[in-house]
Amino acid sequence: MKKRKSCFIWLLCILLLVTVLPAVDFTDVQAASVSSTFTGWKTFGGKKYYYKNGKKLTDLHKIGKYYYCFAADGTMLTGWHRIHNRFRYFGKQTGRMRINQTVNGRKINSKGVWTPVVVLDPGHSAVVAGGYEPLGPGSSQLKEKDTSGTQGVATGVEEYKLNLSIGLQLRTLLQKRGFKVVMTRTNSKVALSCIDRAKVANKANADAYIRIHANGSDNSSISGALTICTTRNSPYISSMYRKNKALSEAVLNAYVAATGCRKEYVWETDSMTGNNWSKVPTTIIEMGYMSNPSEDRRMQQSSYQKKMVRGIANGIENYLIK
């Protein structure tokens, strides 16, 4: 009986140790065993590290003939990453930075930098393009070339002004992050049809075409953001569905995460002329409802606009390199 009781106590002690004591990170244990004079490669837990005089390297470094990059914990990076606001690719197996190559259709220059192109389209304008245009290539259905957009129910601010403000701020942030940015408009004095805007994106061969809008509804209680893309069975550009959907999801998720606004959904529809005529990855971001007094006021706050801009930028980047 005493023997059974003793075994039970030992078993209980072992269980307590397992549940109470912190898990041992054997990678850290192995790393701690590296000599203070060691310089070279080490692999722990399937991850590669480079040591110089016993210390893990972090950031971008030239080792021998090649450049490598290491995360803050020293892990060797692979794939696409934005390093010091420049987009670079590191081989999946070797971790070597690529130069003078094309990877996934993306041209990398002699300095190891790929510069993604983003076209920003601040929706609407003070001067509205009159008349009608085909809904999509080859379509007999016509739709207005543009509309005046909506207006803030509480602030009175026209949508085209908000769209342009966000677009210009977004351009600045994206350029700082290493993007090339093309704008469909930088003022509100020009009338542009939806096809005109799509042509700008097509000519630039954009890696992402972001159409910036704000929403409106007869129901003033509705709030939140949504994105819009073409459908899987689009009669105009079905080949772009996968990329359009992925871009729409990435932008919406990042925008909601940055702003904390209500998340609606990705609306798949072939009723948007600008989307139908675009030959590059495209989404419309409806940033919020100007028909909701609270959301309307919020979207005019500079602090909130910074969150809006950061969210869209993060979404574009997530789509391109993750």
Stretch-by-stretch model annotation:
Residues 131-154, 217-245, 250:
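A short, glycine/acidic-enriched catalytic loop
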Residues 211-219, 228-231, 263-322:
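Active-site-adjacent mobile loop/cap segments within catalytic or ligand-binding domains
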Residues 4-116:
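Extracellular adhesion/carbohydrate-binding repeat motifs centered on closely spaced tryptophans
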Residues 157-165, 191-195, 238-246, 299-307:
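Soluble non-cytosolic domains of exported or imported proteins
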Residues 168-180, 202-207, 214, 252-261, ...:
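Sec-exported extracytoplasmic/periplasmic mature domains
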Residues 113-198, 204:
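Active-site histidine-acidic residue metal-binding/catalytic motifs
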Residues 240-268:
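Active-site-adjacent substrate-binding region
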